[in-house]
Amino acid sequence: MLSPKRTKYRRYHRGRMKGKAMRGNKLTYGDFALQSLEPGWLTSRQIEAGRRVLTRYVRRTGKLWIRIFPDKPITMRPADTRMGKGKGAPEFWVAVVKPGTMIYEITGVTEPIARSAMRITAYKMPVKTQFVAR
């Protein structure tokens, strides 16, 4: 699963997801893409699940690009813990996705295959998505 090798700080603020994606919203590498339509967090597990579906579906014919990277650590406290005693330990990593962000791009396959592969991948995503063709 994806995670950064090192970060400047161990813990980050959760932040707010405002506005549309200004970067990473164009089809850059492939011919077909999966684009988010709403803001949200994609965990490294969800990104990996989508990658597995796409690689199995397109076999060796297509090439896949993952356009997002989980670089934000999400901390959690143990259950039944009183308030105070600092912020919790990092539990998992997420990628912040805004509306318009391209999540996956593929090339080297026909449009019907790409469309059905992206549809299956979209079921694994926590945000609404759409299929984009060049």
UniProtKB/Swiss-Prot annotation:
Pfam families documented for this protein = Ribosomal_L16
Which Gene Ontology terms describe the biological processes this protein takes part in? mitochondrial translation
Name its cellular compartments: Plastid, Chloroplast
* Gene symbol of the encoding locus: rpl16
Q: SUPFAM superfamilies, per this entry?
A: Ribosomal protein L16p/L10e (SSF54686)
Q: How does it assemble?
A: Part of the 50S ribosomal subunit.
Family, as annotated: Belongs to the universal ribosomal protein uL16 family.
One molecular function GO term is: rRNA binding
Family annotation (PROSITE patterns): RIBOSOMAL_L16_1 (PS00586), RIBOSOMAL_L16_2 (PS00701)
The GO cellular component terms are:
chloroplast; mitochondrial large ribosomal subunit
Against InterPro entries, the record matches this protein to:
Ribosomal_uL16, Ribosomal_uL16_bact-type, Ribosomal_uL16_CS, Ribosomal_uL16_dom, Ribosomal_uL16_sf
UniProt entry keywords in alphabetical sequence: Chloroplast, Plastid, Ribonucleoprotein, Ribosomal protein
What is the name listed in the Swiss-Prot or TrEMBL entry for this protein?
Large ribosomal subunit protein uL16c
> Which PANTHER family does its entry note?
50S/60S RIBOSOMAL PROTEIN L16, LARGE RIBOSOMAL SUBUNIT PROTEIN UL16M
Tagged with keyword Transmembrane helix: no
